[in-house]
């Protein structure tokens, strides 16, 4: 396999209860994650050596983002470091909106590169890598509506709400990393 295309869904939190602060800096939470019909599109093409990112958003073209970080962490598991990847992303999920776009992109990158590079890493290992990237990444690896506890990484499948939702996006950016 030399090429994979995928869609990365957004999510909303139907509720969020922030509990105690942990030693690792995260907070324990209780939340309800709901996948929504808003997507970023990504493609992955096997190349040699480098990780290259092309995007409609300039800030994603460098190395300081969840896509590059995820690809680098997966690449550490290659016995043949000659593999690389060209990742193209069409960003549609508003950045900093709390909809999980970066986490969704990270999860898609982990899943796609495990397939593209034939790594056959276990689900447990993939989730472990996901947790290193961010608290919401395991939810997007899970890929279903869920009740989240712990830092949001302990997941129990829940049913979908059957209502139409109207989304409102703020022009404010939420610096999620700041609140770790």
Task: Please identify what each model-predicted range represents.
Residues 11, 105, 136:
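Acidic active-site catalytic centers that drive phospho-/nucleotidyl reactions
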Residues 76-86, 112-129, 133:
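Phosphate-handling active-site elements
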Residues 2-83:
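N-terminal beta-alpha supersecondary unit
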Residues 2-7, 15-31, 119-180:
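ATP-dependent small-molecule kinase catalytic core of the GHMP/sugar-kinase superfamily
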């Amino acid at each position: 396999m030399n090429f994979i295309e995928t869609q990365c869904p957004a999510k909303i939190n139907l509720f969020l209860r922030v509990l105690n602060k942990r030693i690792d800096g995260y907070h324990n939470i209780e939340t309800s994650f709901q996948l929504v019909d808003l997507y970023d599109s990504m493609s992955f093409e096997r190349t040699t050596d480098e990780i290259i990112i092309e995007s409609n958003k300039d800030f994603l073209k460098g190395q300081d983002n969840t896509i590059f970080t995820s690809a680098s962490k997966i690449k550490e598991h290659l016995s043949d470091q000659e593999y690389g990847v060209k990742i193209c992303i069409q960003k549609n999920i508003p950045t900093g909106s709390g909809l999980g776009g970066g986490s969704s992109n990270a999860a898609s990158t982990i899943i796609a590169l495990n397939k593209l590079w034939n790594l056959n890493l276990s689900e447990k290992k993939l989730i472990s890598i996901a947790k290193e990237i961010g608290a919401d990444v395991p939810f997007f690896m899970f890929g279903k509506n869920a009740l989240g506890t712990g830092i949001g990484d302990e997941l129990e499948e829940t049913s979908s709400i059957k209502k139409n939702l109207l989304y409102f996006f703020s022009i404010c950016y939420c610096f999620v990393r700041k609140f770790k």
